[in-house]
Curated annotation (Swiss-Prot):
Protein name in the entry: Importin subunit alpha-3
Species per Swiss-Prot/TrEMBL record: Homo sapiens
Modified residues (N-acetylalanine): 2
Residue segments, region NLS binding site (major): 137-229
Motif Nuclear localization signal per record, residues: 43-52
UniProt gene name: KPNA4
Quaternary structure, from the entry: Forms a complex with importin subunit beta-1 (KPNB1). Interacts with SNAI1. Interacts with TALDO1 isoform 1. Interacts with CYB1.
Amino acid sequence: MADNEKLDNQRLKNFKNKGRDLETMRRQRNEVVVELRKNKRDEHLLKRRNVPHEDICEDSDIDGDYRVQNTSLEAIVQNASSDNQGIQLSAVQAARKLLSSDRNPPIDDLIKSGILPILVHCLERDDNPSLQFEAAWALTNIASGTSEQTQAVVQSNAVPLFLRLLHSPHQNVCEQAVWALGNIIGDGPQCRDYVISLGVVKPLLSFISPSIPITFLRNVTWVMVNLCRHKDPPPPMETIQEILPALCVLIHHTDVNILVDTVWALSYLTDAGNEQIQMVIDSGIVPHLVPLLSHQEVKVQTAALRAVGNIVTGTDEQTQVVLNCDALSHFPALLTHPKEKINKEAVWFLSNITAGNQQQVQAVIDANLVPMIIHLLDKGDFGTQKEAAWAISNLTISGRKDQVAYLIQQNVIPPFCNLLTVKDAQVVQVVLDGLSNILKMAEDEAETIGNLIEECGGLEKIEQLQNHENEDIYKLAYEIIDQFFSSDDIDEDPSLVPEAIQGGTFGFNSSANVPTEGFQF
């Protein structure tokens, strides 16, 4: 067995394409689908607080709208500083209503009006919780705008006051402060770490209890997502350690919104590197995460697939933790899911398993997933085909001879060769790399493989790639032609024809790693 492993390790060195090694074979999400990198759900992107009808105060809608439209910003600013509590509250409320409008709220106009310091001062008015609530709401909506608008709120020294309001005896004030802090934290790693440094985590987590209203808990969970977001740099290790026990509780919640946000938080943490992946594993949450791959809600499935997909970009040992939770049993349904994005992410996951060790490659084969990958290589949308090409190519690097022979038996060559004409140079290179590996591994059977490549039109495509503008591609195409399709080949010698086995197929040279049933392709 040790000799076989040495041979396989040597083969890895010989067959890997330039720049392809075990580290780069496992591909993180940002290399795979750039547009999905942030993948903020709609409500995350639109950080603005929508205005429920019940939150519009005593005035009738008509009266309130009339007052807002007919009150100049100058008057609002002036009245917001009034000593008369009624006038002051109405002015702050008018500002909040302007900011709550669905169509182009005048955030910049309000910032320029000089109202920010006044609103921030209102946060200190413990004697007037209604004023605190309205001011916090207005500031929340200003912070929901552009990064510059969020920074304006931060620079007005609002954050320490929002943190103070987390201890308010009035729940609506607490909840509004949570929402405001979520918008500020979501602006980026600098704001996130600033708010963390002021001590947001403990009071935030203290809200998680059976008695908390569901809408409030949704807000708290959403802020936790923002705390876990961003990986340049990732959140402080101490913060992750504080948050993980709460995520271990929330992953059992029955509310779909809370569950989705909990799993997205895990996906962001596992996207930050192997150290963070290990922290998530050590929390014991993975056995509760994997079953969510078959959750009835697509939103939950999508988030879970991303989270486990990030974990298997880690080491073989970290990958094995996911496989030990019977993860592969969920993939027949994911590979045939009506949503193409789920197909694509599922194949991306599997491409990182086939980049693993030979036992992990065998697990994919034993789960009968290879024919499904090949089907998507042939019939999937281009994004999914690209992932399938990686999955196949990685298997030709990581797999044993019999495992690669199984690929051939499943008729991988025609759909693999079809991708040689796509415009994406990376895909072409991945396919050429895989074909080269297969041909080298075939040894005495290389001619048989060559015939399969030629019969499906692959040889003609490889010949054309010798003129490709990409240097790596034309060199690899030339090497394949030179080594395996040279016109100097001797005439076919009957004694060299591979022996036919049952079913009219052929066997690889049986000098190493021969399973009892023999090689077949």
